[in-house]
Amino acid sequence: METMLSATAITKLRDGKLMLATTYNGLFIERDGEWKQILNGFQKRIRDLHSEDNVVYGVGDEGIFIRSMNGGENWTVQRFPTKATSWNVCSNVQGTVIAHGDKTLYHSNDFGSTWETIHPFLEYGGGAPSIRSLFLYKHYLFIGTKIHAKYGGVWLFNLETRKLKRIKIVMNQMISALTVHNSYIVAASGSCKGISGNISFCKIDESIESEKTYWHTCQSEQKASSYLALSVDQHVLYTTSTQNKAGISTVCRVLLEEGLVTVCDSVKGHGWRIVNQKEGYVVAGSGESKVMQWKKKII
């Protein structure tokens, strides 16, 4: 185990290298067991990093978007036309990239060189929900909202037909993360009030094809206000939480087959992001970042 700087995002590259977005000191990459700073000088925090082969995308505060086509050697830094924080960026190997503003999507088909703005909730006008999380699956985009008393929950947006449908109704919690695991779509949710954060899941084919979607909620070994991040690798699924009153958050294994969320570690501050390599993982936390059982020796 090793702890490092306060951080907001983490990703792993194709060759197993780790890239960390720190809270105050820019981006670092782990090379040959050492962490080296590769990008700094911008004031905005990066809230998510996503890599596809050797291409890395990052998004964050006030619409910042960063991109490297060569594993972090060179970077393009630009801004989306929004003052909102972009919490998620997703992509595929064909060059599709999607990020978000408050109620808008930014969609690219050329690795982020050019962009189209999409308003998925246009018909809801000023009452539209704000976006908190995204997950791309084939040509379907799963959208998780911030807390919204009327339109909160998980939505499914078809990028080909541009049709939108709501697949999970959640009024009093944000959907902070979405992922796909063993043919299920998995949602992490919660709010800053109470201890009702949960992990829920449904069959992905059912969510796309059926009129009614049945969600199952996992039992949590230890209560949390909210779960914040999800990471899956080789059928191993992890989640992280917000910090408790003592300033400590949890790292948990999610066992969908048993319907359980089991605690396996703790981190100082909020567990903003996690990336795993089977059972090994790295957490980007607001108080510290933590490395557990990663195959490369990290100094």
Where are these regions (language model features)?
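Conserved Ser/Thr-centered positions that define the repeating blades of beta-propeller domains
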Residues: 13, 30, 67-69, 108-109, ...
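Solenoidal tandem-repeat scaffolds enriched in leucines and small polar residues
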Residues: 99-180, 187-193
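Residue-level signature of beta-propeller blades and closely related beta-rich strand-turn architectures
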Residues: 24, 62, 103, 147-148, ...
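Surface loop/turn motifs at the tips and blade-to-blade linkers of beta-strand repeat domains
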Residues: 1-4, 39-42, 79-82, 119-126, ...
